[in-house]
Every structure is written in C-alpha cells, then in structure tokens.
Amino acid sequence: MSKKPVVLMILDGFGLTNKVDGNAVSAANKPNLDNILKKYPHTQLGASGMDVGLPEGQMGNSEVGHLNIGAGRIVYQALTKITKSISDGDFFENVALNKAIENAKKNNSTLHLLGLLSPGGVHSHIDHLKGLIKLAKEKDIKKVYIHAFLDGRDVAPSSAKEYIEDIEIYMQEIGVGEIATISGRYYAMDRDKRWERVQLCYNAIVLGKGEEANSAVEGLEKSYRDNKTDEFVLPSVVLKEGKPKAKIENKDSVVFFNFRPDRARELTRAINDKVFDGFERETLDLTYVTMTEYDSTLENVEVAFPPEHLNNTLGEYVSKNGKKQLRIAETEKYAHVTFFFNGGVEEPNEGEDRVLIPSPKVATYDMQPEMNAYEVTDKLLERLDEDKYDMVILNFANPDMVGHTGVFEAAKKAIETVDECVGKIVNKVLEKDGTAFITADHGNSEEMIDYSTGKPMTAHTTNPVPFMYVSNDSKELREGGKLADIAPTMLQLMNLPKPSEMTGNSLIK
C-alpha cells in the first residue's frame, strides 16, 4: 500500500511582490504554479525581520529561513536575542555578566568593556554596550573603561566620530564609563592568525602602550590626518595626566561584547588563555565574559548568551514518532535541508535519509540557470515510488542562486525550470494521495532591480513568500502566518500532536 507522503518543497529565493519591474517570478512562464494558485488554497508568510527572529526590516536568508521552518518556532538570532533581553530587562540579571560585576566589586577592580563600537549589527551593536554601561551603573561599579574597536566596514569608512561621541554623551548622562583605548578592527578583530596585528591591540589594552592621545576623538582625528580610516586606526591609548587612563590588570573583569565569534577569538585568546604562543605575554588572572560562545575550547570564560539547543525540531519529533523522512537538495542548499533544518545538528535523525545531488560546476549560475533541478526531481520521483517516506523536505536552489547573479533572463529561466519540476512532483504526490506544500525561505528573484538606482539587485528581499497546499482534500488556510507555522501544519497532516517546544501554529483554518 502506498504511503501518503507529506512533501515540503522549498523554492529558495522565491518571494512575492506586486511590483512588475525586475520581477522574474511574475515574468516567468510557469503554468504549473499558476494552475496551483488557481485551484488550491494558498497564503503568504512572513520570512524576514521579527517573523524569523531578525531585527525589524532585516531581509531573511537561507540559514535563518530553514532554521525557523525546521524548528516550528521563531529562532531569535544573537543580535535580536540580546537586544530583546535588554528591553525585557533579563539582561541585567544575566548570570555571566553579573559574575563580572561581582568580581569587580569584591576586588575593587576595573570593569573593561571591549568590542566593536558600531550600530552595524554584524559583529556587535552599540546598544549592547549601552546596556552594559547601564548594568554597571545600576550595580554601582565606579571604574568602567571602554576599549573601542572602530568599524568602517559594516558602516561608512569614516563614521567612528559619530559613535564615539554618541557613547561619550551616554556615559556622561548616566554618570559612569570612559574610553581608555581605540583600535581599528584590522588590529583588534583579525581572524587569520596575524598575531603582529593583534599584538598591537593587546599592547594598548593590557600594557598601555601604543599611539597616544588626550581623547578618543583626538586619536581618531590624528589617524584621519595620516589617511587611515576607522578600520585601520592604529591602537591608541587615551591619556589622563600623561598616563594611560586604564589597562587590563590582574583581578579585573572583562566583557567582550561582540556577538559574532569569528573575529573575537584571537584577542580573547591573547588576553585570557593560560597557554598562548601567538606572541610573548604575561598570564593574567581575570574574570572574562564573552557575549556569545566564541569557541567551545576556550577555557576560563563565562558566556553570557550560550548557544540554545533546539529540542523537538520537526525532523527530530517525526523521527521519535517512528516516521521515515527524506531530505533532498543539490550541493548549494544541502546544508540547509539537513544541518540548519535540524536546528544546527549535523547527525541525521533515525529514519532520516539524505540525497545530495552535486551542483553544476559553472563559474556563475546564470550560465546554467536550470542548475541540477531536473536531477533532483528525477531522484525524488524514484524515491517516492519506494513508498517508504512519511515526510520529504526538498529544496530547489535556482530562484536564489540565479537571482544572486542579477541576470534577469537567467532568473526567469530558473523559475521556469522549477515550475516544470514542481508540476512533476505534485502529480506524483497526488497520485499517492499525499500532500504537497510549496513555500520559500526568503525572497530574491521577485525583485531584481534596485528601485532607487535602477541597477540590478542581487540581494535577498524582505518580501513575503508563498505557501500553497496541494492535496486531494485541501482545506482553507489562514492569513498572517510566518515560516515557524509550517512545521505545525505538517504535523497536523501527519496526525501528530504539536510538541510544546513549537510555538508556531498550524496554517489550516
């Protein structure tokens, strides 16, 4: 007897907009998808900003999209999680951060706040630094010093003065905190073991040695006169009465407030590792806190926001209930339907089979917009005929990968290819009396023109994505959904109760 499979097709980068210019989705000849929209229930889902745990107005991406779909709940990204905890007030009770506070109190020592002084939101956010300064004030810590790393990459190249003045005004108003050093991120945030760069930053922060200035702005302006933009500002020590304002010493507390790990590891190791061979330096006895987990092998470190383990993701829960599942995609999106869909877990669940179709070897995908969608489809049809699987997760990479090239005609061809493949799969699923859900993880190829400049746009969008429900017994769908609502919908079709960890809600009315 044939199983009634529940098949989720993720058309990567297939968003929806009413705009016609630069819209490869609406321009493509796609009889199958058009027919599905006429004949079957469909709705739109939020796939960007707060709907997927990102800051408001931030475009979605494939990692975040698959994480949210697979988790069946909004998965807050580090930036949003920390910002939310400040506004909710939990931040001020954070155990790791309060260890730094208690140590400074107990030893009458200094609290040092290190990180990228920027609203860029890629590695850090200036608002998180303000949260730390506020915490120090609330807990009555008197000696608070900022070691400010200057950005110039995720924000304009010479914009640091604005952020220095912003934080200095904030510290004056709140009544605690001073900037002790400034360093361009080129030195402070290396990630390629260029220890000679890191050492210059270390020397300023720990030894009080480097370029000298009477204020942070003075140090910055000197750098500008030497034609060095923010990123390349030489590590500089701010003096008070001819001496460094502050340097990291034994028994001090350090909080590194970058949330993205890759460029925060090296300086952390240089300051805090007991055994270190990057350059010669003394070992310090510190209370050292990192905003997120920079590396699981770091010792003597407290983590303020440790990684969350997502229990009962869709794949794990279906597996626990004895069901069989298949994940299938070509190379470009294989990690997304496996690792990210499973909440950042590499190991397959029990009863989870995986099929990887190699992506074509071309320089850019506009040269082969069909990619290997036909091979993915053929392989899936074969597997469906085995009548083994209760659930299938499939990704077509074309609308996203070809959308990124900015070549409109190629993106159109990509959509047409996917339409052909969707048609074949839907027919097979209906033949087996199964259900096909068709959606996307984020937008891209529906908006290939930057409307403000008229130039090609290669980025993702903040547009909603479709959700189509194809079966011999389709029911009505509600409006106002988001990606996290897909897993509960699929579970309903599989007659499985939703686990308590899933906070998404079924889209079926």
Swiss-Prot record:
SUPFAM superfamilies given in the database record:
2,3-Bisphosphoglycerate-independent phosphoglycerate mutase, substrate-binding domain, Alkaline phosphatase-like
Note whether Isomerase occurs among the keywords. yes
Recite the UniProt keywords alphabetically: Glycolysis, Isomerase, Manganese, Metal-binding
Tell me the pathway. Carbohydrate degradation; glycolysis; pyruvate from D-glyceraldehyde 3-phosphate: step 3/5
Please tell me one Gene Ontology term that the record gives under cellular component.
cytosol
Question: Does the entry feature the keyword Isomerase, yes or no?
Answer: yes
Q: Which reaction does it catalyse?
A: (2R)-2-phosphoglycerate = (2R)-3-phosphoglycerate
Which N-terminal residues, if any, form the signal peptide?
A: none
| EC main group | isomerase
Q: Which cofactors are reported in the record for this sequence?
A: Mn(2+)
How is the co-factor bound, per the entry? Binds 2 manganese ions per subunit.
Q: Which residues are involved in binding Mn(2+) 1? A: D400, H404, H460
Q: Which PANTHER family match?
A: 2,3-BISPHOSPHOGLYCERATE-INDEPENDENT PHOSPHOGLYCERATE MUTASE
- Oligomer status and interactors: Monomer.
Annotated protein name in UniProt: 2,3-bisphosphoglycerate-independent phosphoglycerate mutase
Instruction: List the source organism.
Output: Clostridium botulinum (strain Langeland / NCTC 10281 / Type F)
Q: Which gene encodes it?
A: gpmI
